[in-house]
Every structure is written in structure tokens, then in C-alpha cells.
Amino acid sequence: RFNAPSGVGRYTLAEGLESGAHKVELVKETYVGTNWTLHGFTLTGAGLLAAPDTASRHIEFYGDSNLAGYSLMSEQNESANRMVGCHYTYAGITARAFGADYHNVSVSGETLRGMKNLYDREDYFDTEPSWDFDRYTPDAVVMNLGANDIWGASENTIKQRYVDMLDLLRAAHPDAHIVVYNGWGWD
């Protein structure tokens, strides 16, 4: 695990390896407002093997810091973008357990009301362009929101926010299984 500094750079992932096949898994873990672009790989030796099959299952997650992985990499709950990592959150672990590809639309501190304004964005900071839901069709949609809504909202208000958000997700993903969970034990 490493944090790439600003600008363009080269990074040696491995050297001095024995002959044979080797696997490289690149996990890009960025948080809202941070962009990172992979420009390519340079290999020495025989070259690339055939790419593995793409996942046949697809899951889309909507959530708050629990799914975003905010401060996940810090035992002291340090709040820094370098401490973010959804690879080891419920979203990442669940997707790998099912052999699925996944999209994670999660933001630390997010509420049901706030996600209604974000779920269909291509860019967190811009309302346009809107995300084209035909670009990614999940088999399942998982929503873990609501924990941050408890501050200043009544139980009925929170329930209505769930209904509103579920209506939006159902319209966007008419054929997906939708799973809602939270850690607060609401009915």
C-alpha cells in the first residue's frame, strides 16, 4: 500500500522475481475530491498473460463512512483522505466473497437526504453530467444509510427518507435485488 504524491510518477511494484507467472492486483482507493489516473504498466520479460475473466456478478453500494471506509486504515480513527480504503470495508469484502465487480457510491457523514442529491452524479462536486445508469447494471444494490440521519430528524422523517431513497434506487435499477441494512436496529 502506498500513497502516490501529486503529479506524474513511476513506481516499481516488484523486481528480482523468479521466472514464471506473477499476479499484480492494483486497487485504486480514492475518496471524493481526489483523482488518480493510471497511465499504464511497463513490464520486462515475457509480457502479459491473458486477462482473467470479468466478473459475472455486479453489486452497487450506497452508504456513509461504513461503506466508504473513511479512517478505516487508522487505529486512532484519524480523519485523513490517506486513511480511506473501501477494499477492506463491507462493500469490498462482500464483492470479493461473491466474485463480483462493484461500484461504491459512499461518502463519510452522508445521510439519506444527502444521498438523494448524489446517487446519480458522475462527479461528486458537479450536478452535470448525470451518471448514465445504463453504463453499469448491478444484480444487487446494497444501501447502508441512516446512521447520520438520527441527528435532528424524527423516526417518521427517517422512515420517509428511506422510502424516498428506495424509490429512486428502484427507478434507477428496476431489475436489481435491493438490500437495506443499518446498524441501529430500526424496523
Name each region found by the language model:
Residues 1-62, 66-83:
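N-terminal secretory targeting modules
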Residues 8, 30-36, 72, 76-159, ...:
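Conserved SGNH/GDSL esterase-like catalytic core that processes O-acyl groups on lipids
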Residues 22, 30, 98, 166-169:
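Hydrophobic, Leu/Ile/Phe/Ala-enriched alpha-helical segments that form helix-helix packing faces
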Residues 54, 136, 170-173:
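Short, conserved loop/helix-junction motifs that constitute active-site signature segments
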Residues 142-148, 166-187:
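Active-site segments of SGNH/GDSL-like serine hydrolases
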